[in-house]
Amino acid sequence: MLQLPVFAALPVQNVGLSVPSGIYSNMSHMRARAMNKSDFEFLYSLLEEESFDKDRIKMIRVACIGNYFTSRQCASMLSLLNFDSYRLEALEYLAPRVIDKQARDVILKEFAFVSNREKAEALLMGQKRR
């Protein structure tokens, strides 16, 4: 069972956004940083402790608030889910928070079926799931 007090212990990282100096700041130059290794290991251990995929997805959803992830971190979290349908559901929350989408192959390998890999790639490219 998901316990909300657990989330109070979940670190919400300063995303480290930097805005170029000058009169005009182009927002496209802002860059987020992925969750650091120790915080991610803590999150991963919390996810491992959950018994049900639905509870893991809820925790992933909360972890996405204020945090960013590498493709490898995203794939690690998806690997804890038992079915592609749950992986796709979790990826809906994770995809906008992945900072290195050019390395998406590591994420796509977590999907057993080609059709689901295609859906996952669409999510990573910013398309909504139907």
Regions found by a protein language model. Give the residues of each.
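General marker for long, soluble alpha-helical cores
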Residues: 2-130
